[in-house]
Amino acid sequence: MPPVPPYSSPTPRRARTGRLSPTGVLQVDWPFFGELCRALALKVYHAYDPDLVLGIAKAGVIPGAVIASILQRDFASMAISRSESGARPVVIAGPPKLVTGRRVLVVDETCDTGDTMKLALAAVRDLKPAAVKTAVSFRTGPYAVDFHALETDSFIILPWDREIIVDGEIVMRPDYAEKLRANGE
C-alpha cells in the first residue's frame, strides 16, 4: 500500500470561506471554522508537541476538541466566565489534575486583552505542567498568544453561537441581528 501523502491545509482566507463585510463583521461558517482549525493544528504540530489540549469553556472547547482530534491528543476542559459584559473573568471549573507533568496547549476561540488566557495560564501553572503554550482561532487584540489562526479586529459571529432558542423558536441571537442591522447587512 502506498504511503499516505501529507495533508496540507490551505491558509484560511476570508474571501473564499468566511464572510468579512466592509463594515467589519466576520460571519464564520462551519467550513471556514474547519479550515481555521486545520491551519491552527498544523502551526501547533510544527512548533510544539502537546500531550494534552485544554479548551476554555464555553467557546474554546469547540476549537480545542477539534484541534485535539486532529493532533490525536488527549482533550480536557476548564471553565472561565464573566458574570456580565466587561466584568473580570473568574475560574468556574479549574483545569484537571492530569495537566501535572504534561505538555499542555490551552485553547480559546478569541483573545483580546488576554484576561481570560492569563487566568487560565495561572490555573494551569499552579498544577505544574511540564510546559504550556496557548492557541486561539482569532487573535482580536494586543495579547500575544503562542499560536493563532487568524488576526482580525472585526466583530465575529461563530457558527455555534449564531442562533438561540427564544419562545420555543430558533432565531438569530438578537445582539448579533442588531449588530448586522447596524452595519447595514
Where are these regions (language model features)?
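PRPP-associated nucleotide enzymes
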Residues: M1-E185
